[in-house]
């Protein structure tokens, strides 16, 4: 595994070569930093989490619990704190962007120019948008920014899966993963839609991190843009030359509980004059929010994946509490009514194999009965263990026997081998990396008998 900390500063205590930036350490700045980096209070260990583009002055506690300022030695990282008075143009729909330009007296063509530069070229600096007049650069910069989420950490697995820990303007975090195709030089970007998750599926690590908030459209589409930054895929390449060829909305959170922001983000991603990902290359996964499934299909027309994982209400109630609200009968009816579902665009049923819970031959036959008449295919996912999980992974013989029953009935039912397991990027393993680190740090401090009152 390769681990890379991005924007890692060297710590300098008061004095020394920090004098040149002391003026930045005003009370207003400190209050803003406390909002952005609440987890950094009281611990030098979290200094590496400061992303490029944020001010790198933080408040740290000395041994006698007196607050003092520490500075990053890299001047390039000592920049102005985020200006909340400026509107981020990323995440605005075309109509919203046109309205913003109209508010400053500009015609719709200005919005079209900006759209091209932001989403086709990946540009964030107005001064480098050469088709826009120089006189306009300053006017735009006074009111607007083009900003992606900050990258706190990038992890690369032995199998080339890549995971980014992203930090948003308010200090909250989510994870984004690039999953390479096993056979081709391309892959999918798995994006998150919530900080934490509304649901509490018992087999899923993300479900142990309760919902904090929904992500905005900017924070959702921004994840794909961060991935493109990392792989250097700007300007938007032709379909044949794309490594980041697909989007799967399968990260942290339930997308249909944040549908408006998810829809806006995906509409931006699908726009042919920008990022240009075809709807046929986008798959949205839901745990079964029945009332929103039809609207999703009608508005977006993307591929649907359903996190099924059980063939009876009894088992699904146990491992997926959402089933108590939308039981299997209602869920399967919503699947049958999903717009655009056909033999050419089958619904994917995701099925995590849990040893002794849902992995028997009888379960496989019941699954066939459940989807009868539906244009369906299956992804069989051996359970990916995580610390504290209560489930086990079935052996390969059991999993293959399950798959064979489905395939003998004419369905595609590959066994999806875990990708990125060594960096906790596999299915069901996503959870804020820094939250794990803070939990580990808290345990270590407790074991050492050190008070932890300043740790979140």
Swiss-Prot record:
Cofactor binding remark: Binds 1 [4Fe-4S] cluster. The cluster is coordinated with 3 cysteines and an exchangeable S-adenosyl-L-methionine.
Stretches the record annotates as Disordered: 1-21
Annotated keywords: 4Fe-4S, Cytoplasm, Disulfide bond, Iron, Iron-sulfur, Metal-binding, Methyltransferase, rRNA processing, S-adenosyl-L-methionine, Transferase, tRNA processing
Top enzyme class: transferase
Cofactor(s) named in the record: [4Fe-4S] cluster
EC number: 2.1.1.192
GO biological process assignments: rRNA base methylation; tRNA methylation
Record: active site: 175 (proton acceptor), 427 (s-methylcysteine intermediate)
Binding site for [4Fe-4S] cluster: 197, 201, 204
Disulfides per UniProt: 190-427
UniProt xrefs under NCBIfam families: rRNA_mod_RlmN (TIGR00048)
Sequence similarity: Belongs to the radical SAM superfamily. RlmN family.
Descriptive protein name: Dual-specificity RNA methyltransferase RlmN
Organism name: Paramagnetospirillum magneticum (strain ATCC 700264 / AMB-1) (Magnetospirillum magneticum)
């Amino acid at each position: 595994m390769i681990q890379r900390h991005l924007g890692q500063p060297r710590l300098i205590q008061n004095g020394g070569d920090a004098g040149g930036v002391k003026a930045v350490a005003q009370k207003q700045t400190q209050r803003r930093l406390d909002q952005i980096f609440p987890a950094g209070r009281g611990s030098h260990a979290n200094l590496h989490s400061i992303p490029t583009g944020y001010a790198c002055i933080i408040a740290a506690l000395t041994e006698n619990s007196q607050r003092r300022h520490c500075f990053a030695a890299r001047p390039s990282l000592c920049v102005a704190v985020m200006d909340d008075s400026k509107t981020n143009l990323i995440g605005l729909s075309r109509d919203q962007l046109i309205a913003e330009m109209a508010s400053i007296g500009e015609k719709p063509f200005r919005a079209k120019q900006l759209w091209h530069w932001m989403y086709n070229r990946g540009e964030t600096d107005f001064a480098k948008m050469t088709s826009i007049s120089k006189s306009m650069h300053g006017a735009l910069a006074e009111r607007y920014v083009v900003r992606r989420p900050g990258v706190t950490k990038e992890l690369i697995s032995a199998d080339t899966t890549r995971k980014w820990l992203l930090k948003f303007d308010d200090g909250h975090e989510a994870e984004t993963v690039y999953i390479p195709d096993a056979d081709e030089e391309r892959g999918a970007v798995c994006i998150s839609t919530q900080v934490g998750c509304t649901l509490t599926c018992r087999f899923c690590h993300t479900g142990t991190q309760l919902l904090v908030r929904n992500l905005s459209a900017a924070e959702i589409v921004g994840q794909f843009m961060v991935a493109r930054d990392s792989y250097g895929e700007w300007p938007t390449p032709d379909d044949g030359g794309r490594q980041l060829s697909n989007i799967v909305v399968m990260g942290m959170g339930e997308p249909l509980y944040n549908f408006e922001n998810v829809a806006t983000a995906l509409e931006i991603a699908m726009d042919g004059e920008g990022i240009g990902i075809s709807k046929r290359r986008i798959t949205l996964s839901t745990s079964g929010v029945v009332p929103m499934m039809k609207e999703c299909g009608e508005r977006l027309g993307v591929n649907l994946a359903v996190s099924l994982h059980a063939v009876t209400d009894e088992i699904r109630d146990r491992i997926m509490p959402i089933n108590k609200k939308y039981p299997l009968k209602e869920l399967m009816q919503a699947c049958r009514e999903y717009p655009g579902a056909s033999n050419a665009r089958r619904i994917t049923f995701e099925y995590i194999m849990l040893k002794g819970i849902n992995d028997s031959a009888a379960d496989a036959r019941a699954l066939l009965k459940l989807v009868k008449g539906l244009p369906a295919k299956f992804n069989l996912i051996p359970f990916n263990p995580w610390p504290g999980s209560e489930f086990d992974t079935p052996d390969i013989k059991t999993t293959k026997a399950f798959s064979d029953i489905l395939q003998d009935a004419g369905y595609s039912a590959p066994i999806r081998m875990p990708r990125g397991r060594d960096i906790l990027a596999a299915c069901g393993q996503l959870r804020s990396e820094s939250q794990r680190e803070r939990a580990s740090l808290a345990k270590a401090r407790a074991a050492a008998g050190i008070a932890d009152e300043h740790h979140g």
